[in-house]
Each structure stands twice: as structure tokens, then as C-alpha cells.
UniProtKB/Swiss-Prot annotation:
Belongs to the UPF0342 family. It holds the Pfam family Com_YlbF. It comes from Oenococcus oeni (strain ATCC BAA-331 / PSU-1). Signal peptide: none annotated. It comes from the Bacteria. This is UPF0342 protein OEOE_0901.
Length: 114
């Protein structure tokens, strides 16, 4: 019998073969091919990472850091390749959420039945 980790590796391969993953790959390639979108996407990722790192240390971001993040997010969301990427990311996240519900169903049942 395969171990849980073997099953997880199989699921990772299945994820890569899914339409959602392929759509994400295509959408991301379109962002990278568009100089303006790629630059805006990069700026957003840098600003977001900066805030996340502070929060992971229990620190609050400075108002100017939050403003920079919001500004880069607004700029990025105005660009079609990034809008399209966001839709595809949401679809993939929905699928992963459903998979997570299936995987964790035994845990939920355990807590509800005891």
C-alpha cells in the first residue's frame, strides 16, 4: 500500500496535469511576455513579500509600505494579463480548496463525532 506521502506526490503530478494548472501556466507566461504587466507583477510581489515578512516576525508594516503595496496592487489589477491571471489563480485555489475539504473530511468527522 502506498504511503500518504506517495499519494501526495501522485496528487502533485495530477495537479500539474490538470486544466487549471495548465491555464495558470499559460496566464503566467502571458504576464511575463508583457513588459508592463511583468514589471507591475514583480513590483506587487516585492511589496507583498516585504509586508508578509514583517508580519511573520510579528511586526506591523509602516503606512508607506502598505500604501506602496496598495498602489502596486491597483496598478497591476488594471492590466489585462494580470486580471486574467487573477481569475485563473482563483479557479485553481477553488479546486485546491475542494481537494483540501476531501482530504480533511476524516479529521472533521473525528472532531464532530467525539
Amino acid at each position: 500500500m502506498a504511503t500518504l506521502f506517495d499519494q501526495a506526490k501522485l496528487m502533485a503530478r495530477e495537479l500539474q496535469d490538470s486544466d487549471e494548472f495548465k491555464q495558470l501556466s499559460t496566464a503566467l507566461a502571458k504576464v511575463r511576455a508583457d513588459q508592463e504587466a511583468n514589471s507591475a507583477f514583480h513590483d506587487f510581489q516585492v511589496a507583498q513579500k516585504e509586508i508578509q515578512e514583517l508580519q511573520s516576525k510579528g511586526e506591523e508594516p509602516k503606512p508607506e509600505q502598505i500604501q506602496r503595496w496598495q498602489t502596486t496592487a491597483q496598478k497591476a489589477q488594471q492590466l489585462k494579463p494580470i486580471k486574467d491571471l487573477s481569475v485563473v489563480e482563483q479557479n485553481l485555489n477553488n479546486m485546491l480548496g475542494e481537494v483540501n475539504e476531501i482530504i480533511t473530511a476524516p479529521l472533521n468527522e473525528l472532531y464532530l463525532n467525539n
